[in-house]
UniProtKB/Swiss-Prot annotation:
Chain intervals for the UniProt region annotation (DIX-like oligomerization domain): 9-103
Comment on protein domains: The DIX-like oligomerization domain is required for polymerization, edge localization and biological activity.
Note: 'Soseki' means cornerstone in Japanese.
Quaternary structure and partners: Homodimer. Forms long polymer filaments with other SOKs proteins polymers crucial for polar localization and biological activity.
Name this polypeptide is given: Protein SOSEKI 2
Record GO biological process: cell division; plant organ morphogenesis; protein polymerization; regulation of cell division; specification of plant organ axis polarity
Coiled coil feature spans: none
Localization (cell): Cell membrane
Keywords carried by this UniProt record: Cell cycle, Cell division, Cell membrane, Developmental protein, Membrane
Membrane-protein topology: Peripheral membrane protein
Function comment: SOSEKI proteins locally interpret global polarity cues and can influence cell division orientation to coordinate cell polarization relative to body axes.
Record family assignment: Belongs to the SOSEKI family.
């Protein structure tokens, strides 16, 4: 620093201009003069020099601070106009830093917003008085009938500025008119709109608006004349816009060109199909009518508006839709009730679970069991058992729903017919009904009818003496069919047993056509020991009851001269039944009957030697029965 004899001193000042916290400009150096009576230059002296160099207002747009040492480091000390600027202690230099002042009025963002507002103000239309349009006076029209046409025109004129428009506003109006009316400029017919609205309200059941439409008939004619006069002046009226954008649905304009096929969303019909287990297995069918509908088949395409609200209102459309739906339904699907006849002498408990076989053979002839409302052909091919229950206090005829009646169709049962021509030897069984220990409990029974063809019987059973069967007879016996042995069964109560599935013989396999699985019914615990009665009888006098044996786990009883044998009350639940044939008694104990399987039609005896034959026998069981009914002639 050089001193002079003048009244001013000159110093060199280095300053840095910064427009941001992290952005610094290249340093500049200027010479500053200050009076000699001052100890150091001030910020006012620096600004005076910068005004002469950079122009007026430049120094005031920055905030200034000088660099000084502080505790072994450097800091920036802010100064004002009258503050002194101190040099660095090491070098004696004057270093200043200028930061741009953040003024809200001069902010770039605010300047951009202000500029954008000015551009928008130039585009907005003005009224005749030169002022901007008042948007608070523009209202959306919800109902055309409630607003006078003159008022609607006045609002549009005020919004569009009357006849004073610039070129940009005119182009926008023409584009909006093209979007609203499509390729045609036809005037909407208010009478057709009133008829469509009346049809729509008749479907929804609104009676209040129906009276309003009838009273506004004369008003619609005057409204049509006003629309024709002022249509050119109100091209963008919200009441005439398309209904797809949330506008009015009653004044939807017609469309001169419609697609030949339109997607129509109709109702969805839920129909419960016939719950036959052999066909449907209880599935539900939902049929939806979301299909393509040809607009030419419904009516004239010119008279059909494009509004989705008024489309279902055309005459004949709902009727045709219902007729098409009605023709698709089958008779079994329309049936909702079924009548089930209850047996007056048979009451069966409701099953808790059920099983059925996959294949069941059937013969030809009249049915012996009731299988629900099916034809004879369907019962022969896909016959399913029907388990039903009736109370002693209820009437003999019980009406149930189709779902409840067919719900038990999964229960397996054998329904076979009797061939009267090829049947000569017949064994039958009657109802065996036993009273329960509980007075309020229902009686449980099983009825089995067995038909044994003559060619299936052994020679000694027919002639009374033993004869060795021929080769042809063995072939006939080995190939049993449903016509030679036919049985009819009814549901019965399953007897609880602890036997496992491993004790079942080969003749009781589920794949066997004569071994269906019976329903499982739970019964209450009783104090008395269960009693099992096995009854068998034949019409042939050569076959006596001496050839019949009844056995249990712990005891075996044989009877002679009787056609029916009853086990004592303390007999075990697991009983064996065998039919002994002369000279073949040693094989009789090999074939067992397990009551826990509850098979009412099965191969009870299966002999494996060359002289042995297969004979099917039916067993009648009754639980808690103290006595048996009288046996009829030729049967039990």
């Amino acid at each position: 620093m050089d001193s002079s004899s003048e009244s001013y001193h000159k110093i060199e000042v280095i300053y840095l201009l910064s427009k941001g916290a992290e952005q610094d400009d290249h340093p500049h150096m200027i010479q500053v003069q200050y009076p000699s009576h001052q100890h150091a230059p001030t910020l006012r002296d620096v600004k005076f020099r910068l005004t002469a160099l950079r122009g007026r207002g430049m120094p005031d747009s920055y905030s200034w601070s000088y660099k000084r040492s502080y505790k072994g480091t450097f800091i920036w000390c802010d100064v004002f106009d009258g503050d002194d600027i101190l040099p660095l202690s090491e070098s004696g230099e004057y270093v200043l830093k200028a930061l741009e002042v953040m003024d809200s009025s001069e902010d770039a963002c605010d300047r951009g917003v202000e500029h954008l507002g000015q551009e928008v103000a130039r585009v907005l239309p003005t009224n005749r008085n030169g002022t901007s349009a008042n948007f608070n006076e523009v209202h959306s029209i919800d109902d055309v009938r409630r607003v006078a046409p003159n008022k609607c025109v006045e609002v549009k004129r005020q919004f569009m500025g009357g006849s004073v428009h610039n070129n940009m506003t005119g182009k926008a109006n023409r584009n909006e008119q093209g979007d609203a009316y499509g390729t045609t400029s036809r005037v909407p017919d208010p009478e057709n709109c009133i008829e469509n609205k009346r049809c729509l309200e008749s479907m929804t059941g609104s009676d209040s608006s129906r009276s309003n439409i009838s009273t506004d008939e004369s008003y619609g004619l005057s409204f049509e004349r006003d629309l024709k006069m002022d249509m050119k002046e109100m091209p963008a009226c919200p009441a005439t816009r398309s209904t797809d954008h949330g506008g009015m649905s009653s004044l939807a304009p017609r469309s001169s060109r419609l697609s030949r096929r339109e997607y129509v969303k109709c109702k969805t019909w839920a129909v419960k199909e016939d719950e036959n287990a052999a066909l449907n297995h209880g599935r539900l069918s939902r049929r939806s009518s979301d299909t393509l509908r040809d607009s030419n088949s419904v009516g004239n395409t010119v008279d059909i508006p494009s509004s989705p609200v008024t489309r279902p209102c055309f005459p004949g459309d709902p009727l045709i839709f219902m007729l098409k739906k009605a023709t698709k339904f089958h008779r079994s699907q329309l049936c909702r009730k079924a009548e089930v006849e209850g047996s007056p002498c048979a009451t069966v408990g409701k099953p808790s679970s059920s099983r059925h076989t996959s294949k069941i053979r059937h013969g030809s002839g009249p049915l012996k069991a009731y299988h629900g409302p099916h034809s004879s052909k369907s019962a022969t091919q896909n016959s399913r058992p029907v388990t039903y229950e009736t109370s002693a206090k209820e009437s003999e005829r019980d009406i149930r729903s189709l779902c409840q009646f067919l719900g038990a169709s999964n229960v397996g049962s054998v329904s076979q017919t009797i061939n009267k021509e090829g049947t000569k030897k017949t064994g039958s069984a009657r109802h065996i009904q036993a009273g329960s220990n509980d007075d309020f409990d229902f009686a449980r029974h099983k009825e089995v009818a067995v038909d044994i063809s003559e060619k299936l019987l052994l020679p000694e059973q027919v002639t009374g003496r033993y004869e060795k069967p021929s080769r042809m007879s063995k072939q006939l016996i080995n190939k049993l069919d449903s016509k030679s042995l036919n049985m009819v069964t009814r549901p019965a109560v399953r007897l609880s047993s602890k036997l496992g599935s491993g004790q079942a013989s080969e003749s009781f396999s589920p794949a066997s056509p004569h071994a269906p699985q019976r329903p499982i019914v739970s019964r209450p615990q009783e104090k008395a020991v269960n009693q099992l009665s096995l009854v068998a009888g034949f019409e042939d006098p050569q076959i006596t009851s001496s050839d019949t044996s009844n056995a249990g786990l712990s005891c075996t009883s044989k009877a002679s001269g009787l056609k029916a044998v009853k086990l004592p009350r303390n007999a075990s639940n697991n009983c064996y039944f065998s039919l002994t044939i002369p000279d073949l008694e040693k094989r009789a104990a090999d074939t067992k009957v397990y009551p826990w399987r509850e098979n009412s039609a099965f191969n009870s005896i299966e002999l494996y030697s060359g002289t042995l034959q297969k004979v099917d026998l039916a067993i009648n069981t009754s639980f808690n029965g103290a006595t048996l009914g009288e046996l009829a002639s030729g049967g039990c």
